[in-house]
Swiss-Prot record:
Upper lineage: Eukaryota, Metazoa, Chordata, Craniata, Vertebrata
Gene Ontology biological-process annotations: meiotic cell cycle; proteasome-mediated ubiquitin-dependent protein catabolic process; protein ubiquitination
Protein's recorded name: Kelch domain-containing protein 3
Expressed in which tissues: Expressed specifically in testis, particularly in pachytene spermatocytes.
Organism the protein comes from: Mus musculus
Function: Substrate-recognition component of a Cul2-RING (CRL2) E3 ubiquitin-protein ligase complex of the DesCEND (destruction via C-end degrons) pathway, which recognizes a C-degron located at the extreme C terminus of target proteins, leading to their ubiquitination and degradation. The C-degron recognized by the DesCEND pathway is usually a motif of less than ten residues and can be present in full-length proteins, truncated proteins or proteolytically cleaved forms.
Amino acid sequence: MLRWTVHLEGGPRRVNHAAVAVGHRVYSFGGYCSGEDYETLRQIDVHIFNAVSLRWTKLPPVRPAVRGQAPVVPYMRYGHSTVLIDDTVFLWGGRNDTEGACNVLYAFDVNTHKWSTPRVSGTVPGARDGHSACVLGKIMYIFGGYEQLADCFSNDIHKLDTSTMTWTLVCTKGNPARWRDFHSATMLGNHMYVFGGRADRFGPFHSNNEIYCNRIRVFDTRTEAWLDCPHTPVLPEGRRSHSAFGYNGELYIFGGYNARLNRHFHDLWKFNPGSFTWKKIEPKGKGPCPRRRQCCCIVGDKIVLFGGTSPSPEEGLGDEFDLIDHSDLHILDFSPSLKTLCKLAVIQYSLDQSCLPHDIRWELNAMTTNSNISRPIVSSHG
């Protein structure tokens, strides 16, 4: 029984950020917020959410080891990707309005909170943003995105073997997925499932004739072939800047945006790779408002969703509107315990808590007390 159980405000106000779950913590890297200064080059920020205490903290800036020498830290960016392999977060790609796109690989040690730039070899992908990254064993797969130097969408697959730090351009077989950016790619078993994103009628070139495909594409990492997939009778609307995650061998997507429909989404869909069918899921409880560019991470049997941007309630739902960046966080519980359901009842009906054990009262307080690290809200146009 899926249920939205927690809704808190006051976290990092971020859009197009990237995040990974490490145990009961979620590490969020970069992104942007309307109204902030992005002309000045600065270090990427790192926020950590504790899924037990339900509190956010922000890591302090990295100080240079040698005075006068800049520390090895990625610059602030958006549209990048992060993956976790063992105790290391690998951050790749993304762009900044001053520096442009980047193709330097950064490694973040979750134990020491130190950054490094591993020495890599092979065919390094061109700098880009809006790509996807997913992991199979020690290998990170990069697909798609918008390449800065070529000034076009990509449908290439690159893989990085982190045991040898070698990049390879994968020579794929079969009919490849269309060029796109701000899609999702999720690894289930040995298969990478690509959904959504923004494509163009003119193939790799951006002409503002956008396409939002809602067919799922599957890449087999063993044969390095794009598979021919059957058509499905029920499909979610095509979208970009949505979230996707795998749980118990199935693929879920949430939210996103379709410019041709002038619509933001807050729907949840489940894809079963065995039957190759989609099903719309209606969780209990109050979920997030329609949005795009948010982050989703799996922590145990829970999904932690935070940030993103939505049209202002005073505006229409078209592509020309004021956007409001979010500092909220929502938790979707796949199997809420009886204890969790009881706490939700206490909150919903404002029941007396004085007779409850101290630890339960502490948990109730955490579930209802907002964080306080977000910036004041600023709306942006576009």
